[in-house]
Amino acid sequence: MNRITNLFQTQKDGILSVYFTAGYPNLNDTASILKALQAKGIHMVEVGIPFSDPMADGPVIQEAATQALRNGMSLHLLFGQLREIRSEVQIPIILMGYLNPIMQYGFEKFCASCVEAGVDGMIIPDLPYADYIADYKEIADRHDLKMIMLITPETSEERIRLIDAHTSGFIYMVSSAATTGAQQDFNEQKQAYFRRINAMNLQNPRLVGFGISNKATFEAAIAHSSGAIIGSKFVQLLKSEATPAEAVDKLLEALKQ
């Protein structure tokens, strides 16, 4: 069974998924970060594929992507790192990246490499839903890779229902249409959006991402979904703390404050 499917079958709520950029802060940090996240009880990991024009990301992840590329990170290298560490890491791993580097690698080859490396799913923020259905879904399904699609407060109910019907794993509920980055709290407008999506009774579980960095935003996310995705906050901590384990500890502390 796909590890993402298994996670949502065994853990119905309070799921914490953490994002980091491959190759940041150092080229060969992937294994130590993954092991630290698993050791501290993180349920799922999103590994970012660095790209030179990350349009959905805020300044923290943009800077991390730039540094990772300078460090020499590539898809070929990342797949090698994941293959080496997979036997020691049991939690689901999702690759998150923009379409350009994936297409340069070749989508069919990308999916095959994901399977070899033990990757369970992918998030491609700039892949339009219609293109996914027409050109990518059959290939991803053949490799048992979950394609996780994003929805925002601006996504129509019709589109949300189509995404729910034609994808599996979970739906990535973006807290706002802006870029990633920390927020102090989710205002009433955002919480109304969360409630509206809940009222649709979708078949897929949902995780809330973008802007989660403290107790208030984390608790709001898990109150309205199966869990939360944290990225920018953890990427900042990887830079400021001495080790990945200390960065995870600081992250978990922040979610209690």
From Swiss-Prot:
A cellular-component GO term for this protein: cytosol
| Enzyme Commission designation | 4.2.1.20
What highest taxon heads this organism's lineage? Bacteria
Q: Which reaction does it catalyse?
A: (1S,2R)-1-C-(indol-3-yl)glycerol 3-phosphate + L-serine = D-glyceraldehyde 3-phosphate + L-tryptophan + H2O
The record's annotation in PROSITE patterns points to: TRP_SYNTHASE_ALPHA
Q: Cross-referenced CDD domains, in alphabetical order?
A: Tryptophan_synthase_alpha
Query: Which terms does the record give in the GO molecular function aspect?
Result: tryptophan synthase activity
What does the subunit section of this Swiss-Prot or TrEMBL entry state?
Tetramer of two alpha and two beta chains.
| Family classification | Belongs to the TrpA family.
Q: What is this protein called?
A: Tryptophan synthase alpha chain
Q: What is the source species?
A: Parabacteroides distasonis (strain ATCC 8503 / DSM 20701 / CIP 104284 / JCM 5825 / NCTC 11152)
